[in-house]
Amino acid sequence: FECSISCEIEKKGESCKPKKCKGGWKCKFNMCVKV
């Protein structure tokens, strides 16, 4: 399982490649949500 976003890694302390939330999205509650 790959972390879907950077904050997921920070929260769980896992080592994996982050897929950051991009334009129009923000990180909230460990998920990408529309801004």
From Swiss-Prot:
It is found in: Secreted. It holds the Pfam family Toxin_20. Expressed by the venom gland. The keyword Secreted applies. It comes from the Eukaryota. GO terms for cellular component: extracellular region; host cell postsynaptic membrane. One of its GO terms (molecular function) is toxin activity. SUPFAM superfamilies: omega toxin-like (SSF57059). PROSITE patterns: HWTX_2. Disulfide bonds join C3-C16, C7-C27, C21-C32. The keyword Oxidoreductase does not apply. Keywords: Disulfide bond, Neurotoxin, Postsynaptic neurotoxin, Secreted, Toxin. Belongs to the neurotoxin 12 (Hwtx-2) family. 02 (Hwtx-2) subfamily. Blocks neuromuscular transmission. Acts cooperatively to potentiate the activity of huwentoxin-I. Paralyzes locusts and kills mice following intracerebroventricular injection. This is U1-theraphotoxin-Hs1f.
